[in-house]
């Protein structure tokens, strides 16, 4: 679809006359700020692995006295929220704008981080894990689009790839902070004032590591089956413990959430979103903020290309055949099928199980809680 000469002249005149909509921001700075959302994605999905061993501790020791079913639900509520967020995130960004959507998500990330940190019980934890999951899913649908629409063609692939890099960096950061916080606390410990069980099993007044209590379970070679073990723990008179270490692990992701909220407000909106709303002058002003004339050349051709693409998208939308257009176009169909295949394979590898529960699995393999939390860092690397 060619552009009439008169429209080209209008585009050229608009590019010349329209000033930047704000201070110039390099595409590197824009990517660094936007992918804080990706970093939060990775941190919030990975941090729970180190928090779970502490969450299992009794309430008086600082934990939430989790059961295995509740442990699974804590991971599941985040995934349910992520599924809903992924579906609605694109709708939100189409309606309000990519930048505006990321600003909202930064607030949701912060709310979820603080909510999980100060959860008094597991049911409140469920609610805020769902909130975090929504932010995670919506970020996965918004951040890559924002990067792709703002990046110049010459480095678009590299810029969008930063999204995935920051996700795994967030997971590595979560595993590393878990290990550091665990080491600072000396591993899960509790102080027992008395043991009201008929058979003390060697547990009397004093300070014990949580591993010593866990070793009483039949699944770890101890004498107590599931219900017997839970009854034994309930009959312990606990003075205190360091189980609240999990709160420090969870609260740390509030820092990048605040940084994202501040940083994204200094960045321009997507020029392509402006064009979709018919705001051509705003699109030109936004492009001028993130383009380097010496490296990216004049904006006339880019704006013209964006207008042509937008016109095609509108035609397909009005004809109601957007999906049919993708399916009939060989290279688009191939991209879609490859993307679906990779997404399915990625999930069937069981990577989420390792990410959430590796420390628990390693404990059953004979490692101490502290060693298993530290070993999880290798998974992040």
Whereabouts are the PLM-identified features?
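Transmembrane-helix signature of 12-pass secondary carriers
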Residues: 2-292, 298-301, 307-381
């Amino acid at each position: 679809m060619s552009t009439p000469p008169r429209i080209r002249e209008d585009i050229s005149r608009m590019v010349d006359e329209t000033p930047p909509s704000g201070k110039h921001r390099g595409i590197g700075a824009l990517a660094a700020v936007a992918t804080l959302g990706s970093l939060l994605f990775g941190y919030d999905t990975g941090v729970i692995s180190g928090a779970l061993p502490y969450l299992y501790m009794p309430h008086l020791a600082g934990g939430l006295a989790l059961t295995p079913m509740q442990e699974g639900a804590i991971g599941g509520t985040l995934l349910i929220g992520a599924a809903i967020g992924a579906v609605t995130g694109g709708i939100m960004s189409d309606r309000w704008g990519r930048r505006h959507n990321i600003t909202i998500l930064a607030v949701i990330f912060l709310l979820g981080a603080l909510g999980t940190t100060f959860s008094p019980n597991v049911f409140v934890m469920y609610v805020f894990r769902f909130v975090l999951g929504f932010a995670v899913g919506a970020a996965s649908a918004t951040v890559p689009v924002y990067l792709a629409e703002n990046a110049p063609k010459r480095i678009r692939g590299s810029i969008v790839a930063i999204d995935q890099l920051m996700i795994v960096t967030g997971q590595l950061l979560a595993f590393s902070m878990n290990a550091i916080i665990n080491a600072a606390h000396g591993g899960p410990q509790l102080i027992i004032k008395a043991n009201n069980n008929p058979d003390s099993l060697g547990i009397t007044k004093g300070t014990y590591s949580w591993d010593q209590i866990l070793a009483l379970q039949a699944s770890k070679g101890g004498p107590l089956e599931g219900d017997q073990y839970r009854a034994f723990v309930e009959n312990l008179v606990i003075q205190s413990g360091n189980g609240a270490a999990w709160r420090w692990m969870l609260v740390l992701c509030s820092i990048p959430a605040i940084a994202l909220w501040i940083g994204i407000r200094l960045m321009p909106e997507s020029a392509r979103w402006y064009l979709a709303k018919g705001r051509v002058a705003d699109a030109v002003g936004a492009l001028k903020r993130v383009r380097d004339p010496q490296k990216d050349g004049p904006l006339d051709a880019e704006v013209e290309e964006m207008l042509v693409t937008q016109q095609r998208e509108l035609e397909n939308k009005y004809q109601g055949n957007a999906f049919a257009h993708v399916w009939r176009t060989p290279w688009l169909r191939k991209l879609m099928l490859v993307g679906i295949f990779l997404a399915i394979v990625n999930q069937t590898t069981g990577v989420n199980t390792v990410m959430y529960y590796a420390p628990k699995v390693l404990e059953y393999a004979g490692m101490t809680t502290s060693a298993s939390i530290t070993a999880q860092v290798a998974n992040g690397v």
